[in-house]
């Protein structure tokens, strides 16, 4: 007997690991006239350019874009260094193969610059790779009996007449609902932001940009029919040397709004989406305005999206089959599917107080403040996912030191936050991402600064469900003696655990006939009910 089956297209996590490794290079100062005296600040953007999956191994290719802000020995004007390093890392992961799909997200744990001499330095960065290896798995589940099934062999004429193979419309099927989650799309895409900022007239035109820091703020992503809508802001901060000589360093901080959409045929308003967005590449260049002055700032940012779209489906699957006078035996097999347990987002505000290093002079003015989150561990606890790590807050400020007025100070504090995930268990699969949405800093006094940061976390949790499913239905010989010895008419008192399905199958009748004879409006029965059961067939 052939069965109609429905396919569930699933993305299952094969391996989820974090790996720490180092990248080290010896570099030379680009400006041949400069030698580093004092490093003010440094930052990195690490991008994953490609991942190749092999047997028990992945190869990660990436790029490190780093900036150094420093004071040189031969000048009191601040200088900047921007460079790019390509790297390749082979990572052992047992149990994976070339057909699996690996996603790798990079996080900077630490970085250092060790001078070799005035011109050369060793740049060393510690990276943490968040690796998730997935594979596509298709689950076929029986939802109905194929009404075109025919042309089978039977052990006798009675079996042929009652088997339901040439007469499948008389077969009764017992079904149950399962709520499953199918993967609709798993892809990466890019979104480019290109805007111009005008330098206010109160500030001098740009000569040379020595430091730029671009970050995403307040992002909002949603799915629509056939597209993904993206909204957010870019926080732009630069330090520059003016065109005019003998003018002090200047800084500029502005916010750029961006919005747009990406076409994606799988997207609908009701899909379950999990979309990560991060900066992949940034370029900031001064440009001449209509007055022939360097007062325009061209900002170009390439945003990378990792898009996963899921669809929740309620499916009625065959649990049992029966036909009076036939012996139909369902063959069962244990299979695992996944359903959506929860998708949740949470925000928390962190307040950090920072004492200013007085050896750098008194704090006069805060130019810029930033924060970064580094998650070290994720625990499944008390119906929640708990993220534990560090928050690093930094300010760039102007001090009373006339020789080196631009300073930077950072502080690292403990971070812990839970996001509700009702019903989560240790073996459930999940994705969790985090980002800093807003940062601002205020001077409490000349010696202390208060930094407030809003941290957003988003989680999606999948519940693994293992159940028995009908894979095929066999016909076996009918026990003619049992069939003929069963009473044609029977009075019965309902016992605990009885259902109409159970009683019909045991007494060679149908649910419909029991309901008709006993004037039942629905299939609900309870212990103590009295029923009249009439057999529907006889050999």
Regions found by a protein language model. Give the residues of each.
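Extracellular LysM carbohydrate-binding repeats and other cell-envelope/extracellular binding modules
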Residues: 509-539
């Amino acid at each position: 007997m052939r069965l109609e089956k429905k396919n569930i297209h699933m993305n299952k996590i094969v391996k989820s690991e974090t790996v720490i490794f180092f990248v080290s290079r010896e570099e030379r100062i680009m400006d041949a006239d400069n030698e580093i005296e004092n490093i003010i600040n440094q930052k990195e953007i690490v991008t994953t350019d490609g991942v190749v999956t092999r047997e028990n191994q992945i190869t990660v290719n990436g790029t490190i874009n780093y900036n150094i802000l420093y004071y040189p020995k031969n000048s009191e004007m601040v200088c900047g260094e921007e460079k790019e390093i390509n790297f390749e890392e082979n990572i052992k992961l047992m149990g994976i193969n070339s057909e699996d799909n690996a996603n790798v997200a990079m996080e900077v744990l630490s970085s250092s610059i060790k001078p070799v001499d005035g011109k050369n330095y060793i740049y060393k960065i510690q990276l943490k790779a968040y690796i998730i290896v997935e594979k596509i798995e298709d689950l076929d589940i029986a939802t109905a009996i194929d009404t075109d099934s025919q042309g089978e062999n039977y052990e006798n004429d009675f079996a042929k007449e009652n088997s339901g193979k040439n007469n499948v419309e008389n077969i009764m099927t017992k079904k149950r609902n399962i709520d499953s989650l199918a993967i609709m799309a798993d892809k990466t895409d890019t979104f480019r932001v290109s805007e111009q900022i005008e330098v206010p007239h109160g500030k001098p035109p740009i000569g040379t940009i020595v430091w730029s820091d671009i970050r995403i703020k307040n992002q909002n992503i949603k799915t629509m029919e056939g597209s993904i809508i993206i909204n957010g802001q870019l926080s732009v901060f630069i330090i520059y040397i003016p065109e005019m000589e003998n003018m002090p360093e200047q800084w500029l901080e502005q916010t750029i709004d961006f919005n747009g959409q990406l076409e994606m045929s799988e997207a609908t308003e009701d899909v379950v989406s999990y979309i990560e967005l991060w900066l992949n590449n940034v370029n900031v260049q001064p440009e001449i305005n209509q007055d022939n002055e360097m007062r325009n700032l061209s900002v170009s940012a390439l945003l990378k999206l990792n898009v996963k779209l899921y669809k929740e489906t309620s499916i009625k699957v065959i649990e049992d089959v029966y036909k009076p006078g036939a012996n139909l035996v369902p063959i069962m097999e244990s299979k695992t599917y996944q359903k959506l347990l929860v998708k949740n987002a949470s925000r928390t505000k962190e307040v950090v107080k920072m004492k200013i290093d007085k050896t750098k002079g008194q704090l006069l003015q805060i130019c810029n403040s930033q924060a970064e989150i580094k998650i070290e561990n994720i625990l499944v606890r008390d119906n929640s996912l708990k993220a534990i790590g560090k928050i690093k807050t930094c300010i760039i400020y102007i001090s009373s030191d006339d020789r080196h007025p631009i300073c930077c100070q950072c502080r690292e504090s403990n971070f812990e936050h839970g996001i509700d995930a009702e019903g989560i268990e240790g073996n459930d699969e999940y994705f969790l991402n985090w980002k800093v949405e807003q940062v601002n800093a205020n001077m409490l006094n000349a010696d202390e600064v208060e930094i407030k940061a809003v941290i957003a976390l988003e989680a999606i949790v999948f519940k693994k469900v293992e159940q028995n499913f009908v894979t095929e239905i066999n016909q076996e010989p009918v026990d003619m003696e049992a069939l003929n010895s069963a009473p044609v008419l029977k009075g019965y008192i309902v016992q605990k655990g009885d259902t109409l399905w159970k009683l019909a199958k045991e007494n060679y009748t149908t649910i419909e006939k029991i309901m008709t004879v006993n004037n039942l409006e629905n299939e609900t029965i309870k212990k103590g009910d009295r029923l009249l059961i009439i057999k529907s067939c006889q050999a």
